Each structure stands twice: as C-alpha cells, then as structure tokens.
Amino acid sequence: MENIMTLPKIKQVRAWFTGGATAEKGAGGGDYHDQGANHWIDDHIATPMSKYRDYEQSRQSFGINVLGTLVVEVEAENGQTGFAVSTAGEMGCFIVEKHLNRFIEGKCVSDIKLIHDQMLSATLYYSGSGGLVMNTISCVDLALWDLFGKVVGLPVYKLLGGAVRDEIQFYATGARPDLAKEMGFIGGKMPTHWGPHDGDAGIRKDAAMVADMREKCGEDFWLMLDCWMSQDVNYATKLAHACAPYNLKWIEECLPPQQYEGYRELKRNAPVGMMVTSGEHHGTLQSFRTLSETGIDIMQPDVGWCGGLTTLVEIAAIAKSRGQLVVPHGSSVYSHHAVITFTNTPFSEFLMTSPDCSTMRPQFDPILLNEPVPVNGRIHKSVLDKPGFGVELNRDCNLKRPYSH
C-alpha cells in the first residue's frame, strides 16, 4: 500500500483586530470602509440611512466603519499557520477566543467541514441571519482553508478541484468607470447617490450620471449601479427604466436583504435585458436559496460574510442549478481561488480602494502582503499558484489581541 500523508492537528487559534471604533481610524484592511478622509467610498453614497439628513453625506457618520478588521490565525502542531481577514473587529475576537475555539483546536487540519458545521450549529441561538457572527465564522473558515493549503503545499483553488479557466477577468467598482476602462477592466459599477426620499429628482440625477459615463466610456463598456439597500421597489423600477437608454447592464442590491417578494417584483418589471443582482448582505445558505428562487440573474455573496469558502461553494451550486451566475462581492484572494473553479462565474469584481480610483491599490491594503491586483483587468491562474491563499499577514499593522483562552 502507498503511504498516505499524515496531517497534523490544529494546536491553537488566535484572533486579533485593527481599526474600528476602539482603535485607530482609517486603518483599511479587512474593513475596507474604514478609510481616511476624501475617499470615494464615503462620499454621499445612498444608503438606508440617507433618509435622515444628518447621516446623508457620509457613511462613516452612521458608523459603517465601527467594526474594524478581524484577523484569525490557526496554528498546526507542526508550527505551520494559516490566517484570514474579514470585518468583525474586537467583537469577532471575543467570539473566536471564547466560543469557537473549542470546535477548532485538536481537530485535524482537514476537518474544515466538520468545524464549519459545528460553528454554525453552536451559534444558531445568537447568529440570526448572518451579520457579525457569520463574518467571524467566515474568517475562521478562510483561515482553515489557508492552513490546509499550506500544510499540503497547494493553492486553495486546487483543493477545490482546479481552475476551469486560465484567467479571471474583472469589472471595477468605484466612482470612475472611465478610469476603469483605461485600466483594462471589462466594466465599471458606480454607487447611486440618491434615493426614494429624493423623489424623481434623485432618479434624474443618477440617470444623468449613467448617461455621462456612457458618453465617456463608449457603447460596449459595461456600466452597472450599486444601490446598497437604499431603495424601494417602485423607485428601483423607475430608476432601472430611466437608465435603460444608456444600456445599464445591471442594477444591484436595490432592496434590503430579506425583501424577497420585492426582488421578485423588481425582476419581473425591470427593462428587458437588464439584470437584477443582489446578495452581499445575505448571511446564510438558506437565505441564498430563497434569493435564488426570486429569479434574479446574479447572486453576489461575500465570502468573508456569508459563511466562508465552505458556504460559498454551496451557494455556487444553488445558482448553477438554476442557471444563475454567482459573482462574489469583491473579496480579493478569498474570492479569486473560488471563482476560478466555478463554471458559472465568467467574471469577478475588483473593488477600487484608492481614494480617487486612479491607481491600483490592493483591496485589503495594508493588512495583506503580496496581495495581487489585476493587470489589464485580469489575473492569470499562475498568480494564484502559491500554498493556501498565497498572501502573508502584515504584522506591522498594530494588531491587538484583546482576549485569550
């Protein structure tokens, strides 16, 4: 008989945070909303809070950046480590160190699905439909995949079965699709700036923005709108039709996550050929099944928020069974290793984190070292050919470990 590789057990899990309300502001990293002043990501973007004038101008004014970055590191008995980052900050550290640790330590590094199910089952009574708890579980799951890849010496995408294409092509999310086109991206997705409280004037302003970018970018470059849960069905439907003359490719996350009937109605009434998309703030596999049943065109889970890579693979299968695309909310290497193995992900998202969208800054900068960025709008699979997720933790980021066990 051939010898089978003996895998080590997990010795310890540790959790740090940086940024957020209890640390330095503008830290970036896993909480990419935690940016400094004069950044497009915080400039009068429509949100569910925009109807309150005190919180209309800035998303940071209502606390979008209070959580900060969570870093989870798992160490095997042989000394090898894996890690991941997400948005959960100091509270995520508590959950990892005081609750989830019992399901991780002592397990084999390959026991990812067992650990995942135990974490989900043990937090049902306080996790609700996602949010902070699911962000934390996602971060642990990603760290486990990173460790497993490093122990066996393979990139995560090969652990998932290998690439189905040679490269990933990207669209860019940011305020300047015209600059994204110059950088080689296939499309540009802009945030909306107005909402139902602004009435028809808001629709005219956002439609004018799309018209202006269509003129700058030409006929064939993709243009999309990200509405960040800020609308109702009637407003979203009117906005979609107002943008139809400018060949808007899709309208994204118009409604809050649980308004499934609203998404069904929006898809039914949207202009022919315009796609309806959503999913980044859905936090359970069950919610994605229900979202899929509404008939939307693209589901957009965030691998750092939906339950991790283990859940993302399951979501992709649900979408594939219905002929839907799954295009994850931008998550850098954590998405790259997944989508290059999905047959129903023909393109992916790159989130522009440079303040004016004029330069290529890694999404989770500065917390990850060696984080790849698209070149001419693409990343070749060979760039991902490093053990685990292929990135290292920047330990100069003033990481704090508030709890231990």
Swiss-Prot record:
Keyword Metal-binding on entry: yes
Enzyme nomenclature, EC number: 4.2.1.90
GO molecular function, a single term: magnesium ion binding
Pfam families assigned: MR_MLE_C, MR_MLE_N
Reactions accelerated catalytically: L-rhamnonate = 2-dehydro-3-deoxy-L-rhamnonate + H2O
Catalytic residues in the record: H329 (proton acceptor)
Cofactor binding mode and count: Binds 1 Mg(2+) ion per subunit.
Keyword hit for Transcription: no
Site for Increases basicity of active site His, residues: D302
Record: residues binding substrate: H33, R59, E349
Residues annotated to bind Mg(2+): D226, E252, E280
InterPro entries: Enolase-like_C_sf, Enolase-like_N, Enolase_C-like, L-Rhamnon_dehydrat, Mandel_Rmase/mucon_lact_enz_CS, Mandelate_racemase_C, Mandelate_racemase_N_dom, RHMD-like
Gene3D superfamilies xref list: Enolase-like C-terminal domain, Enolase-like, N-terminal domain
Cofactor annotation: Mg(2+)
GO biological process, one term: amino acid catabolic process
Keywords of the record: Lyase, Magnesium, Metal-binding
Transition state stabilizer, annotated site positions: E349
NCBIfam families linked to this entry: PRK15440.1 (NF011968)
Record note on quaternary structure: Homooctamer; tetramer of dimers.
Matching PANTHER family: ENOLASE SUPERFAMILY, MANDELATE RACEMASE, MITOCHONDRIAL ENOLASE SUPERFAMILY MEMBER 1
Role played: Catalyzes the dehydration of L-rhamnonate to 2-keto-3-deoxy-L-rhamnonate (KDR).
Other known facts: Reaction proceeds via a syn dehydration.
Family: Belongs to the mandelate racemase/muconate lactonizing enzyme family. RhamD subfamily.
Name the UniProt record assigns to this protein: L-rhamnonate dehydratase
